[in-house]
Protein backbone atom coordinates (compact mmCIF):
# COMPACT_ATOMS: atom_id res chain seq x y z
CA UNK A 1 0.00 0.00 0.00
CA UNK A 2 1.51 3.33 -1.00
CA UNK A 3 0.88 6.45 0.97
CA UNK A 4 0.57 9.74 -0.81
CA UNK A 5 1.56 12.96 0.94
CA UNK A 6 -1.27 15.50 0.77
CA UNK A 7 -0.20 18.12 3.33
CA UNK A 8 3.34 19.37 3.78
CA UNK A 9 4.61 21.42 6.73
CA UNK A 10 7.90 23.12 5.89
CA UNK A 11 10.40 24.80 8.17
CA UNK A 12 11.79 27.51 5.90
CA UNK A 13 14.33 28.72 8.47
CA UNK A 14 15.39 28.60 12.10
CA UNK A 15 15.85 32.39 12.16
CA UNK A 16 13.56 34.73 14.10
CA UNK A 17 14.03 38.22 15.49
CA UNK A 18 11.58 37.65 18.34
CA UNK A 19 12.50 36.32 21.76
CA UNK A 20 9.19 34.90 22.96
CA UNK A 21 9.89 33.45 26.42
CA UNK A 22 8.18 30.08 25.82
CA UNK A 23 9.56 29.52 22.31
CA UNK A 24 11.84 26.54 21.69
CA UNK A 25 14.53 29.02 20.61
CA UNK A 26 14.52 30.41 24.15
CA UNK A 27 13.88 27.26 26.20
CA UNK A 28 16.10 24.71 24.43
CA UNK A 29 19.63 25.02 25.86
CA UNK A 30 21.03 23.05 22.90
CA UNK A 31 19.67 25.43 20.25
CA UNK A 32 22.43 27.55 18.74
CA UNK A 33 21.06 30.89 17.49
CA UNK A 34 24.34 31.60 15.71
CA UNK A 35 23.66 28.87 13.15
CA UNK A 36 21.20 30.26 10.64
CA UNK A 37 19.61 27.69 8.32
CA UNK A 38 17.47 28.60 5.31
CA UNK A 39 15.57 26.09 3.19
CA UNK A 40 16.51 26.20 -0.51
CA UNK A 41 14.48 25.15 -3.54
CA UNK A 42 17.23 22.60 -4.32
CA UNK A 43 16.28 20.81 -1.10
CA UNK A 44 12.62 20.71 -2.19
CA UNK A 45 13.66 19.30 -5.59
CA UNK A 46 15.73 16.56 -3.91
CA UNK A 47 12.66 15.21 -2.13
CA UNK A 48 9.64 16.10 -4.28
CA UNK A 49 9.23 15.77 -8.02
CA UNK A 50 6.64 17.79 -9.92
CA UNK A 51 4.10 14.94 -9.76
CA UNK A 52 4.34 14.80 -5.96
CA UNK A 53 3.90 18.58 -5.74
CA UNK A 54 0.97 18.47 -8.18
CA UNK A 55 -0.76 15.97 -5.85
CA UNK A 56 -0.38 18.06 -2.70
CA UNK A 57 -3.47 19.71 -1.23
CA UNK A 58 -1.65 22.09 1.09
CA UNK A 59 1.77 23.47 2.00
CA UNK A 60 2.15 25.53 5.14
CA UNK A 61 4.97 27.07 7.11
CA UNK A 62 4.68 27.42 10.86
CA UNK A 63 8.07 27.63 12.48
CA UNK A 64 9.12 25.56 15.44
CA UNK A 65 12.40 27.45 15.68
CA UNK A 66 12.08 30.24 13.13
CA UNK A 67 9.56 32.59 11.59
CA UNK A 68 8.85 31.70 7.94
CA UNK A 69 9.07 35.38 6.98
CA UNK A 70 12.72 35.31 8.09
CA UNK A 71 13.52 32.66 5.50
CA UNK A 72 15.65 34.04 2.68
CA UNK A 73 13.87 31.82 0.15
CA UNK A 74 10.35 31.60 1.58
CA UNK A 75 8.63 33.63 -1.16
CA UNK A 76 10.50 31.76 -3.93
CA UNK A 77 9.60 28.39 -2.42
CA UNK A 78 5.92 29.29 -2.08
CA UNK A 79 5.90 30.63 -5.67
CA UNK A 80 7.46 27.37 -6.83
CA UNK A 81 4.70 25.29 -5.22
CA UNK A 82 1.99 27.55 -6.67
CA UNK A 83 3.53 27.42 -10.18
CA UNK A 84 3.61 23.60 -10.16
CA UNK A 85 0.21 23.24 -8.47
CA UNK A 86 -2.06 26.28 -9.02
CA UNK A 87 -4.85 24.85 -6.84
CA UNK A 88 -2.67 24.13 -3.80
CA UNK A 89 -3.58 25.82 -0.51
CA UNK A 90 -0.70 27.90 0.88
CA UNK A 91 -0.50 28.95 4.52
CA UNK A 92 1.90 30.59 6.92
CA UNK A 93 2.11 31.57 10.60
CA UNK A 94 4.21 34.59 11.54
CA UNK A 95 4.79 37.35 14.07
CA UNK A 96 4.48 39.68 11.06
CA UNK A 97 7.32 42.06 11.90
CA UNK A 98 9.88 40.76 9.41
CA UNK A 99 10.45 41.68 5.76
CA UNK A 100 9.20 44.81 3.99
CA UNK A 101 5.73 45.94 2.97
CA UNK A 102 6.51 45.19 -0.73
CA UNK A 103 7.42 41.61 0.31
CA UNK A 104 4.08 41.29 2.12
CA UNK A 105 2.22 42.73 -0.88
CA UNK A 106 3.81 40.07 -3.09
CA UNK A 107 2.76 37.40 -0.61
CA UNK A 108 -0.80 38.77 -0.55
CA UNK A 109 -0.97 38.57 -4.35
CA UNK A 110 0.46 35.05 -4.34
CA UNK A 111 -1.98 33.86 -1.67
CA UNK A 112 -4.97 34.37 -3.96
CA UNK A 113 -6.74 31.03 -3.65
CA UNK A 114 -9.85 30.93 -1.43
CA UNK A 115 -8.22 28.83 1.32
CA UNK A 116 -4.78 30.50 1.35
CA UNK A 117 -3.99 32.32 4.60
CA UNK A 118 -1.49 33.97 6.88
CA UNK A 119 -1.96 33.71 10.63
CA UNK A 120 -0.49 36.78 12.32
CA UNK A 121 0.37 35.98 15.94
CA UNK A 122 -0.45 39.28 17.64
CA UNK A 123 -0.90 39.09 21.39
CA UNK A 124 -2.75 42.27 22.22
CA UNK A 125 -2.30 45.87 21.16
CA UNK A 126 0.70 48.16 20.84
CA UNK A 127 1.25 48.39 24.60
CA UNK A 128 1.01 44.63 25.30
CA UNK A 129 2.03 42.65 22.20
CA UNK A 130 5.75 42.92 22.92
CA UNK A 131 5.39 41.70 26.51
CA UNK A 132 5.30 38.15 25.11
CA UNK A 133 6.39 38.83 21.50
CA UNK A 134 9.69 40.36 22.62
CA UNK A 135 11.51 42.33 19.85
CA UNK A 136 8.42 42.50 17.62
CA UNK A 137 8.01 46.10 16.43
CA UNK A 138 4.31 47.02 16.47
CA UNK A 139 4.39 49.59 13.65
CA UNK A 140 6.25 47.22 11.31
CA UNK A 141 3.86 44.36 12.14
CA UNK A 142 0.75 46.47 11.48
CA UNK A 143 2.15 47.96 8.25
CA UNK A 144 3.07 44.47 6.99
CA UNK A 145 -0.37 43.08 7.84
CA UNK A 146 -2.04 46.00 6.04
CA UNK A 147 0.17 45.49 2.96
CA UNK A 148 -0.71 41.79 2.88
CA UNK A 149 -4.45 42.38 3.35
CA UNK A 150 -4.56 45.29 0.87
CA UNK A 151 -2.93 43.04 -1.75
CA UNK A 152 -5.81 40.57 -1.38
CA UNK A 153 -4.42 38.12 1.18
CA UNK A 154 -6.63 36.43 3.76
CA UNK A 155 -5.30 37.20 7.25
CA UNK A 156 -6.18 35.79 10.66
CA UNK A 157 -5.25 37.51 13.94
CA UNK A 158 -4.27 34.88 16.52
CA UNK A 159 -4.04 36.24 20.07
CA UNK A 160 -2.67 34.37 23.05
CA UNK A 161 -4.58 35.64 26.06
CA UNK A 162 -2.66 36.44 29.23
CA UNK A 163 -3.47 38.48 32.34
CA UNK A 164 -1.60 41.44 30.85
CA UNK A 165 -3.74 41.56 27.67
CA UNK A 166 -7.08 39.94 28.52
CA UNK A 167 -8.69 43.35 28.92
CA UNK A 168 -7.95 44.06 25.22
CA UNK A 169 -9.84 41.16 23.61
CA UNK A 170 -12.83 43.27 22.51
CA UNK A 171 -10.61 46.07 21.20
CA UNK A 172 -8.47 43.55 19.29
CA UNK A 173 -11.58 42.01 17.71
CA UNK A 174 -12.76 45.44 16.54
CA UNK A 175 -9.36 46.49 15.18
CA UNK A 176 -8.94 43.13 13.43
CA UNK A 177 -12.34 43.51 11.73
CA UNK A 178 -11.62 47.14 10.78
CA UNK A 179 -8.25 46.16 9.26
CA UNK A 180 -9.80 43.36 7.20
CA UNK A 181 -8.66 40.32 9.17
CA UNK A 182 -11.05 37.39 8.74
Residue ranges and their predicted role:
Residues 77-82, 121, 166-182:
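Short, electropositive alpha-helical surface patch
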Residues 18, 127, 155:
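Glycine-centered loop/turn positions within well-structured domains
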Residues 112-126, 181-182:
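Non-cysteine beta-strand/loop elements that form the S-adenosyl-L-methionine
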Residues 1-117, 131-139, 143:
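Conserved alpha-helical substructure of the radical SAM core
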Residues 90, 145-168:
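Conserved strand-turn element in the central/C-terminal portion of the radical SAM core barrel
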Residues 64, 95-97, 123-125, 160-162:
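Active-site beta-loop-alpha junctions enriched in small/polar residues
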Amino acid sequence: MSREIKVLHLESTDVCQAACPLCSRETNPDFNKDIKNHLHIDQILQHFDNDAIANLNKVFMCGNYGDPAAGKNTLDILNYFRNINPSITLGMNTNGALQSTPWWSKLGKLFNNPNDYVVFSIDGLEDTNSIYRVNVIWEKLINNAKAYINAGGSAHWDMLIYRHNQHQVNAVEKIARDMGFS
